[in-house]
């Protein structure tokens, strides 16, 4: 079984790629909101989410409410906490385990994210997940899609090749070992100095 595992992962990656492609093939009818929609995509556990909050508040300054509507697409596990915070206008919960299935749930959620009509989609997670955050970046259909270049702890070369092509920008990362708080600050610094704001 160990011999076949790398090949099974490749097959699985392509199957998800095809499933998502078909789900997003149907013409969408995205909302046309008066404010530019900015998606913040985080699918990680509550510990990483809580550590990110110190940086999260800075996104309100980068994308002020008179011009932008911030929607957090987040893990359902911390939805109740996130919706009480003033850093975003809406929280869009994702049931992570169910999302990583070939299901009506995944199909519908991809369509809902596409229909938000986002202009900007941002995934600040350092260790990106092909089936989760990267798939949601792709589904957003945003003109500007930004993630951390990150590491490959959750991705093989095929997943990295496919997912990187779904982005317009990848924020470079230091090769030095950094804490989660330092990684969050590093990403935001790279994003906020971007010429595309």
Name these PLM-found stretches.
Residues 1-197:
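Catalytic machinery of carbohydrate-active enzymes
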């Amino acid at each position: 079984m160990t011999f076949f595992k790398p090949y099974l992962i490749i097959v699985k990656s392509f199957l998800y790629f095809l499933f998502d492609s078909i789900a997003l093939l149907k013409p969408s009818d995205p909302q046309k909101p008066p404010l530019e929609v900015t998606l913040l995509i985080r699918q990680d556990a509550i510990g990483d989410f809580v550590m990110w909050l110190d940086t999260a508040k800075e996104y309100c300054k980068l994308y002020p409410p008179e011009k932008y509507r911030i929607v957090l697409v987040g893990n359902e596990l911390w939805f109740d906490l996130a919706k009480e915070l003033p850093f975003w206008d809406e929280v869009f919960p994702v049931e992570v385990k169910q999302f990583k299935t070939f299901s009506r749930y995944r199909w519908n959620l991809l369509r809902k994210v596409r229909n938000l009509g986002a202009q900007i989609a941002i995934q600040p997670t350092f260790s990106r997940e092909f089936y989760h955050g990267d798939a949601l970046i792709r589904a957003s259909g945003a003109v500007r899609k930004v993630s951390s270049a990150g590491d490959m702890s959750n991705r093989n070369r095929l997943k990295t090749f496919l997912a990187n092509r779904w982005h317009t920008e990848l924020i470079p990362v230091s090769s030095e070992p950094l804490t989660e708080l330092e990684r969050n600050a590093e990403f935001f610094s790279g994003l906020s100095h971007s010429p595309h704001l």
